[in-house]
Regions:
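C-terminal catalytic histidine-bearing segment of alpha/beta-hydrolase fold enzymes
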Residues: 25-27, 204-232
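N-terminal cap/lid segment of alpha/beta-hydrolase-fold proteins
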Residues: 4-37, 82, 152, 181
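Active-site nucleophile elbow and catalytic-triad environment of alpha/beta-hydrolase enzymes
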Residues: 22, 164-179, 184-185
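Catalytic nucleophile-loop/oxyanion-hole region of alpha/beta-hydrolase
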Residues: 51-60, 71-107, 232
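Conserved alpha/beta-hydrolase "acid-adjacent" motif
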Residues: 196-205
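Short beta-strand element of the alpha/beta-hydrolase
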Residues: 35-45
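Short beta-strand/loop motif that positions the catalytic acidic residue
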Residues: 183, 188-191, 195
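Primarily recognizes the serine-hydrolase "nucleophile elbow" in alpha/beta-hydrolase
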Residues: 91-156, 171-172, 176
Length: 232
């Protein structure tokens, strides 16, 4: 399929060589006109790698073809420093809003999309980020939400927390259903009931927390589909 979007690639931290892996890919909608909404896309990969195609670039092409400025985030792996992925996501949100005029986007309509562990990062951005870097809406595909051992995806938890995996304070901090507050954005959750990788309870817990805080939320659980379907 021919999409016809213009794509730009940028270093996220151009003045920090040690953070050179972090990049964003900006897909512009084919048609100009009024300022467009935007989405920051966080691929999954268990905080060990990144599914850049079906949970990144393929998504961006679709969203851009539907009128969004779509930004794929190639975030760094934690490698023992649990703050790294969220710092990259916050920086990306700042860059997007800071380029609103240049990229012809509406700085008040910047959402986040995340899949699996990328959904955990997107939900972290929605609940833990500084106010100025929080998204205006979130779309989470089969996200990791809780770090409770009975609910979580063990690989994502291990790779993010590393040696601090038994630190109760950090486990609670990254159990994001516990971090929802009145500033958490409206959220759409999409998942499969037969997901054997990330238990559907993760999304249910987050949806329940959003509902308790009277934040608009929708959850769509398909009867089959498994995990990691992205835009395949």
């Amino acid at each position: 399929m021919v999409w016809g979007q213009q794509v730009e690639q940028f270093k996220l931290w151009p003045d920090k060589p040690e953070a050179g892996e972090a990049e964003i890919f900006v897909y512009h909608p084919a048609k100009g006109g009024k300022a467009a909404p935007a989405v920051l896309i966080c691929p999954g990969g268990g905080y060990r790698g990144l599914a850049m195609n079906h949970e990144g670039h393929d998504m961006a092409k679709w969203y851009a073809s539907n009128g969004f400025v779509a930004v794929v985030l190639k975030y760094r792996m934690p490698e023992g420093v649990h703050t790294i992925p969220l710092s990259d996501a916050e920086k990306a949100m700042s860059v997007i809003r800071g380029n609103a005029a240049k990229w012809n986007l509406d700085a008040n309509k910047v959402g986040v999309i995340g899949s699996s562990a990328g959904g955990h990062l997107a939900a972290s951005l929605s609940t833990l980020a500084a106010d100025a870097n929080r998204p205006d809406f979130a779309i989470l595909y089969y996200p990791v939400i809780s770090f409770d051992n009975m609910t979580t995806h063990g690989g994502s938890k291990k790779n993010l927390l590393g040696k601090d995996i038994e630190n109760k304070e950090l486990v609670d901090r990254y159990s994001l259903q516990k971090q929802v507050d009145d500033k958490t954005p409206k959220t759409l959750l999409l998942l499969s009931d037969d997901d054997q990788t990330v238990p559907p309870l993760n999304s249910i817990l987050y949806y329940t927390a959003l509902n308790e805080h009277h934040i608009p939320a929708s959850l769509y659980m398909f009867p089959s589909g498994g995990h990691g379907w992205g835009f395949r």
